[in-house]
């Protein structure tokens, strides 16, 4: 068995500390979620890992929603929940791939030979493709050595690097992904139809209750009536770079990083050329707005994408460019270069300079169309503002964020925040379990997204408090300041009885408290810099004792019933990110 480097810094926490309430709540929350997740899995999945529902294609209740029912489970295990969580979500992923490979459409030509091909969506948009990777893309946090996982990571990335002749999604000359609809069978190079989006006709009234509110299939079609302009590139496709960063963190092969940066850098250039606003359509010839009559704001899910809600006749803004921020975060993770953060910060500021005073109130635009900026609201445009601040740690970026909640706690303004939000999570789990137990749906009256509201994994609070991190969205990697490993069990996650609270973050420092709630057993925990060892730990201080580190992790021995504040100096984004666990590197 590989041993930890004996020359690395080892810390000791031996100050007797009665277990703080937050620590007891944290440990119990991990335990309670595990029990609730087991009940959820037993209720909605069969022995093969198939979701017990009617499998359909489409943007409302499609394949992505089926596996999204386990959103948060990979993080839950990586935080320290039992291995049963890992086993369940891996089983569900295997079942998901089989279930949606077998599932075929009749009327929708795109998926008549299977909704998945080569274990990947055949051809759909990255609003949904990304959601469908919410579980798989985070498996590397806990189980990067799984051979099937490794094979898929490389295959999926290859779909966007022209390594598969059946999937010519990427144009290296113009540095574009050639359509909003793309996947294992390549890009769709025609206008999409409402049927392409909605899926095959289906009985609705009396059988299903679509979560988008449609009362019949005609309304499902009407929902997507205007979703036609999908040819050419769109910021949504930047989410595909999460496949590239995953493959790079798995293999360390330069080709994955090179492709990721080539593609993101092309978007950096387009945004700069467009006055600092990321365009929502790039033509097949590489020109801004090339498939939309030269309109940089055109296209499905674009800056001008305001559609009619069929049930009410009202208008709904469905600009989805904000999901493109994933690509800039991936580029930052791969390089540590803050210019990728600058792009998004500059865009937020540029949009808000177009403010207007309307009826005596300052209003800020959120959409752009033929008549210029519109959809003015009292709140400044702030999509991605939390990411910008978190990645930069530039205090000037706090201007777009509320100084309450988690940010307020990190700023020292809400000392009771941890206990309050942890207690709230218990209420959330109770409510979801009650809803699940009252659910009267059957497999043949259940859409793929119906169980989602009952998913008891509540990891947002734990991610903030334990890791000092952002909750991953839509297939994105985990961005966090620290992560924990159990060196005795050789697994990811904080060891039994240990609790951690990140109390303060600065550009070069993290302050956290470690507690061992067991009065009997000593525990050993590894603290790693970042989710993927991207941050270098310079030193750690416990009281007056400062220990030099200069490595990506530290080992901490915590005596029975002991606890202490640990102040860690670090250099963020100093290392290349990797899935490799601490004991197998350095």
Task: Walk through the language-model features, giving the residues of each.
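Glycan-recognition and catalytic cores of secretory/periplasmic carbohydrate-active enzymes
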Residues: 2-586
């Amino acid at each position: 068995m590989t041993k930890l480097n004996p020359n690395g810094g080892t810390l000791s926490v031996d100050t007797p500390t009665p277990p703080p309430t937050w620590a007891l709540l944290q440990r119990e929350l991990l335990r309670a979620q595990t029990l609730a997740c087991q009940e959820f899995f037993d209720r909605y999945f069969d022995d093969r890992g198939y979701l017990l529902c009617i499998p359909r294609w489409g943007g409302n209740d499609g394949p992505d929603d089926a596996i999204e029912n386990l959103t948060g489970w990979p993080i839950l295990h990586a935080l320290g929940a039992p291995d049963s969580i890992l086993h369940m979500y891996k089983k569900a992923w295997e079942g998901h791939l089989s279930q949606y490979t077998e599932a075929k459409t009749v009327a929708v030509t795109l998926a008549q030979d299977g909704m998945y091909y080569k274990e990947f969506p055949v051809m759909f948009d990255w609003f949904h493709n990304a959601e469908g990777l919410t579980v798989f893309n985070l498996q590397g946090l806990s189980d990067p050595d799984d051979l099937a996982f490794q094979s898929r990571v490389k295959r999926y990335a290859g779909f966007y690097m022209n390594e598969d002749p059946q999937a010519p999604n990427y144009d290296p000359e113009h540095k574009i992904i050639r359509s909003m609809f793309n996947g294992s069978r390549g890009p769709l190079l025609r206008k999409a139809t409402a049927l392409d989006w909605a899926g095959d006709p289906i009985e609705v009234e009396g059988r299903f209750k679509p979560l988008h509110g449609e009362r019949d299939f005609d309304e499902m079609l009407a929902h997507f009536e205007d979703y036609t302009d999908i040819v050419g590139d769109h910021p949504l496709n930047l989410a595909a770079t999460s496949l590239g960063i995953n493959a790079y963190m798995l293999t360390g092969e330069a080709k994955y990083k090179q492709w990721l940066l080539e593609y993101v850098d092309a978007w950096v250039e387009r945004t700069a050329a467009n006055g600092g606003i990321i365009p929502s359509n790039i033509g097949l010839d590489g020109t801004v707005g090339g498939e939309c009559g030269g309109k940089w704001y055109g296209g499905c899910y674009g800056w001008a994408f305001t559609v009619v809600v069929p049930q009410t006749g009202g208008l709904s803004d469905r600009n989805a460019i904000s999901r493109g921020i994933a690509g800039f975060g991936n580029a930052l993770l791969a390089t540590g270069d803050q210019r990728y953060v600058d792009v998004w910060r500059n865009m937020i500021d540029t949009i808000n300079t177009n403010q207007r005073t309307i009826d005596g109130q300052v209003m800020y635009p959120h959409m752009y169309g033929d008549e210029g900026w519109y959809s003015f609201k009292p709140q400044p445009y702030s999509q991605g503002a939390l990411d910008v601040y978190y990645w930069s740690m530039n205090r000037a970026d706090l201007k777009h964020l509320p100084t309450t909640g988690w940010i307020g706690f990190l700023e020292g303004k809400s000392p009771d925040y941890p206990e309050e939000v942890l207690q709230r999570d218990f209420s959330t789990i109770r409510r979801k379990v009650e809803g699940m137990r009252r659910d009267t749906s059957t497999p043949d009256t259940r859409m793929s997204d119906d169980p989602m509201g009952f998913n008891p994994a509540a990891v947002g609070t734990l991610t903030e408090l334990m890791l000092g991190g952002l909750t991953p969205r839509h297939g994105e990697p985990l961005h966090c300041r620290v992560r924990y490993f159990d060196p005795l069990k050789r697994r990811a996650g904080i060891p039994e009885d240990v609790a951690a609270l990140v109390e303060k973050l600065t550009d070069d420092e993290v302050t956290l408290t470690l507690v061992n709630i067991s009065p009997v057993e000593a525990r050993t925990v590894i603290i790693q810099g970042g989710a993927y060892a991207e941050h270098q730990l310079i030193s750690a201080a416990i009281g007056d004792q400062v220990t030099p580190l200069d490595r990506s992790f530290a080992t901490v021995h915590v005596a029975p019933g002991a606890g202490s504040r640990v102040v860690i100096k670090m250099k963020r984004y100093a290392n290349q990110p990797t899935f490799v666990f601490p004991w197998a590197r350095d």
